[in-house]
UniProtKB/Swiss-Prot annotation:
PROSITE patterns: CYTOCHROME_P450. It catalyses: mevastatin + 2 reduced [2Fe-2S]-[ferredoxin] + O2 + 2 H(+) = pravastatin lactone + 2 oxidized [2Fe-2S]-[ferredoxin] + H2O. It comes from Priestia megaterium (strain ATCC 12872 / QMB1551) (Bacillus megaterium). Belongs to the cytochrome P450 family. Gene3D superfamilies: Cytochrome P450 (1.10.630.10). Keywords: Heme, Iron, Metal-binding, Monooxygenase, Oxidoreductase, Plasmid. Cytochrome P450 whose physiological substrate is unknown. In vitro, is able to catalyze the selective hydroxylation of mevastatin to pravastatin, the widely used therapeutic agent for hypercholesterolemia. Heme binds at H106, R110, R302, H358, C360. Could be a valuable biocatalyst used in the industrial field for an efficient biotransformation of mevastatin. This is Cytochrome P450 CYP107DY1. One of its GO terms (molecular function) is monooxygenase activity. It comes from the Bacteria. Its cofactor is heme.
Length: 410
């Protein structure tokens, strides 16, 4: 197998057979790969094994805080600070949120944000999520066809997180436009200016909303965050803006792709789709298996907080240490028949939501949305099938496993 480059992890060609690509990668590469360059930010390491990924996720020697260990800080002379990735790192250094910092800041920020994601609050959303799902499917039922991405998998989580935050319905489409623009620009080193322009538009909108919430507080997450105090330690202005930005983007982008990827996986495994359609009680295990098999987040990352030796290789302090969630989720040492889809799989320690202190805060909400989306879709449209050949589907050039569209008929 040829030397691996960063483009291999996001090329649309490999997206057509993600499992096959990572299976070949794990069979022909060492468990820790070194990339010569990661989007203009210098060299990086990529861990492929489940156990190694768990170590990186949970061991405090691997750090998140880009303010401490970003290449922009340590290697200013050798890094092009005009690239899209550099601009994104620069923004993250100035706009910290719980995803980009370590304790004690992480502990404080997560505690404040978690007040919006208590089990009771998530469970209280169930009727509304079901209602939104029904309304979206009602709107396409008469046509007997839809683009599952545009008509269903994207609108559902956008509406849910927008209502949680108290964002007007007419503004919700902006979020998809901004996140689409950001993701595309971030993959192109020449688009640094576009990254910064898009982030500015996004943050300016949040600032405008915060002014309205200060003047007219409501029973929503944004109003609650404005009032948030923890041991007299208030969210700073930048922390507040970045936390809301994170909730908006993480609250819809990944769930949308989970739903569309999951439906495609079922369509490509008709025996599994029939089994789920005829046995709705399998929905909990089906959701976990689709998270493992078709999860949208393919790559995550940390920084080495000190010189670290893994598999006999020295990772210098400050270098990026990436990990492949896809490879970890098909590790044959952890899963039986890992490259197969089995919605009855019982032991399923997938890493799609991460591990440790950065475990996805919105995991219960994403699970609920997926459970309702898959179950209702198969109940309403039992003859659901692809409208085109799967080879004709187009994937985004992204580190997220994401379809541009998914035409289906029913």
């Amino acid at each position: 197998m040829k030397k691996v480059t960063v483009d291999d992890f996001s090329s649309p060609e490999n997206m057509h057979d993600v499992i096959g690509f990572y299976k070949k990668l794990t069979e022909h590469q060492e468990p820790l790969i070194r990339l010569d360059d990661y989007y203009g930010l210098g060299p990086a390491w990529v861990a492929l094994r489940h156990d190694d990924v768990v170590t990186i996720l949970k061991n405090p020697r691997f750090l998140k805080d880009v303010r401490k260990f970003t290449p922009l800080q340590d290697k200013k002379d050798s890094i092009d600070d005009s690239t899209s990735a550099s601009k994104l790192f620069e923004w993250m250094m100035n706009m910290p949120n719980m995803l980009t910092v370590d304790p004690p800041d992480h502990t404080r920020l997560r505690r404040l944000a978690s007040k919006a994601f208590t089990p009771r609050m998530i469970e209280n959303l169930r009727p509304r999520i079901q209602q939104i799902t029904n309304e979206l499917l009602d709107s396409v039922e008469g046509k007997r066809n839809m683009d599952l991405v545009a008509d269903f998998s994207f609108p559902l989580p956008i509406i849910v997180i927008s209502e949680m935050l108290g964002i007007p319905p007419l503004d919700q489409k902006r979020f998809r436009d901004w996140t689409d623009k950001l993701i595309k620009a971030a993959m192109d080193p020449s688009q640094g200016a576009v990254v910064m322009e898009t982030l500015k538009e996004f943050i300016d909108y949040i600032k405008k909303m915060l002014v309205e919430k200060r003047n007219h507080p409501d029973d929503d997450v944004m109003s609650a965050l404005l009032q948030a105090h923890e041991q007299e330690d208030k969210l700073s202005e930048n922390e507040l803006l970045s936390t809301i930005w994170l909730l908006i983007t993480a609250g819809h982008e990944t769930t949308a792709h989970l739903i569309s990827n999951g439906v495609l996986a079922l369509l490509k495994h008709p025996e599994q789709m029939r089994l789920l359609r005829d046995n709705p009680s399998l929905l909990p295990s089906a959701v976990e298996e689709l998270l493992r098999y078709a999860g949208p987040v393919m790559i995550g990352g940390r920084f080495a907080g000190e010189d670290i030796i893994m598999h006999g290789k020295m990772i210098p302090k400050g270098e990026m240490v990436l990990f492949s969630l896809v490879a970890a989720n098909i590790d044959s040492q952890k899963f039986s028949y890992p490259e197969g889809l089995d919605i009855t799989r019982e032991e399923n320690e997938h890493l799609t939501f991460g591990k440790g202190i950065h475990h996805c805060l919105g995991a219960p909400l994403a699970r609920m949305e997926a459970h309702i989306a898959f179950g209702t879709l198969l109940q309403r449209f039992p003859d659901l099938r692809l409208a085109i050949e799967s080879e004709q589907l187009v994937y985004n050039n992204s580190t997220l496993r994401s379809l541009k569209s998914l035409p289906v008929i029913f």
